[in-house]
Every structure is written in C-alpha cells, then in structure tokens.
Amino acid sequence: MVTMKDLLECGVHFGHQTRRWNPKMKPFIFGVRKNIHIIDLQKTLRYFRYTYNIVRDAAKEGKTILFVGTKKQAKNAIEEYAKKCGMPYVNSRWLGGTLTNFNTIKKSIRKLEIIEEMEKTGQMDLLTKKEALMLRRKKEKLENFLGGIRDMKGLPDMLFIIDAVREHIAVKEGNKLGIPIVAPLDTNCDPDLIDYPIPGNDDAIRSIQLFCKEMAEAIIEGKELREQELEGEEQEEAAPATEEEKKELIEEAVAEGEAEETEEEEK
C-alpha cells in the first residue's frame, strides 16, 4: 500500500497556481510555495488508503471499475494498469453518452466486431478497394474510441478518473447514473462531485502512474480474495465424505430409528 515516501517522490503534493484553485479544496491544502498550492499529504495518505480498501472490496464483490483518463500524461498509464488488473478503460476522447446512452455505444462495438469478422472470413477481399478502405478506417476509429470498453457488457459499477475537471462529461454521466467515482483531486477540482476523492496532483506523470498503479493493485488484491472465497465454497460443496463422517451418520440414523421404535412401543 502507498506510503508517505511514495507520495513525496512522485510529487503528489504539488497543486496548481493559487489563482487557479477551487475554494472547496481549502481543507486539503497545507500551504503555498512560490504561488503554488501545496496539498496536505497527511490527508492524502488517509484518503488514499481508505479508497484503496473501497476499490479492493468492490473488486472482491466482482464489480467492474472503468478507468478513465484521456489527456497525454494519463493515456499510457490508464491503458497499462487497466489491462494489468483486467478492467475496461477509456484513454482516447470520451464520447458523450458512453454511460448515459450505453445502448448506442454497444451498437458501435457491434460494428467493430462485424468488420473484424469480415476481415477474418475474407469477405473484406470481395469488396471494392474504396469500400475496404472506408471500412478499415472506420475500424481504426472505433478501436481508438471503444477498444478499451469493447468487452464491457453493461454499465460499470465504479469509475476511476484521472483529472475530474478535464473529464467533466464522464463525471457528470457517472453522477447522473449514481455510479460511484474515485479520483485524485487537484487544487482546481470540486470535491462535491467525487464520491471517493484522493487529494493530489493529477497532472504530473509520476503522480498519475502512482494513482493508477495503486488502484490496479487494489483491484488485483480484491480479485484474488474473491477467487479464494469461491475456491473455498467449491471445496466445501465438492468435498467427499470421510469414512468417519459416514460412520457417524450411520450411528446417528440407527440411534434415531431405535428411539422412534421405542416411542411406538410405549404408545
């Protein structure tokens, strides 16, 4: 789990210039240095560890956490760590309605699957050069926008967002649908919009990588706990009876039968 040393080394404490702050973030600000707000890392650590447990427990329950981060500094980390923990992600442009109009998104994903099927079966070779070219361009566009969520069968149970200000549409859609949101909150953010905030720098690459890494580790830990529980249940169900158990059961049945016979005789 994250330590104070990790936070300091990754520059999680550096906020925005003081003129760009959101006054609602005041409780999370330690001070000012060279016109830059400094985030209180004691609070960051506390919120970080609390949120880690929330995300771990969600994964333990089999829930889906959608990773979102489309800006340059976040794209690679979002994809890398979402894949590492087996969760869907959006690291290209957020398409309006990704959540609130998910049925339309599913139709677009279906189009991507159809094009891939046409390529696999050789049907693409039967088209004109122009038709094949247009379909391949469409495939590239669909992969770019939807590749990370193509296996997401329904709405996610939770969102993990890097830069809640930039991803305001995703935040708005999540809030509208009542989907809990986890997000690092820089000093320009509105904490009221985020269910599980972690005060911290959401611009520096190392800071973003730390947030993504910790959330991925929480999910992996939760999944492992889930597997252990399921394996335990299966073992309980499938465990063959021991000879001792059989013997006890026979003795129990005989004793019960004899007791019933005695009662009948007394009547």
Swiss-Prot record:
One of its GO terms (molecular function) is structural constituent of ribosome. It holds the Pfam family Ribosomal_S2. It comes from the Bacteria. Residues 251-267 have a biased composition (Acidic residues). Signal peptide: none annotated. GO terms for cellular component: cytosolic small ribosomal subunit. Residues 225-267 are annotated as: Disordered. The keyword Ribosomal protein applies. SUPFAM superfamilies: Ribosomal protein S2. GO terms for biological process: translation. InterPro entries: Ribosomal_uS2, Ribosomal_uS2_bac/mit/plastid, Ribosomal_uS2_CS, Ribosomal_uS2_flav_dom_sf. Keywords: Ribonucleoprotein, Ribosomal protein. The keyword Ribonucleoprotein applies. HAMAP family: Ribosomal_uS2_B. Belongs to the universal ribosomal protein uS2 family. This is Small ribosomal subunit protein uS2. It comes from Nitratiruptor sp. (strain SB155-2).
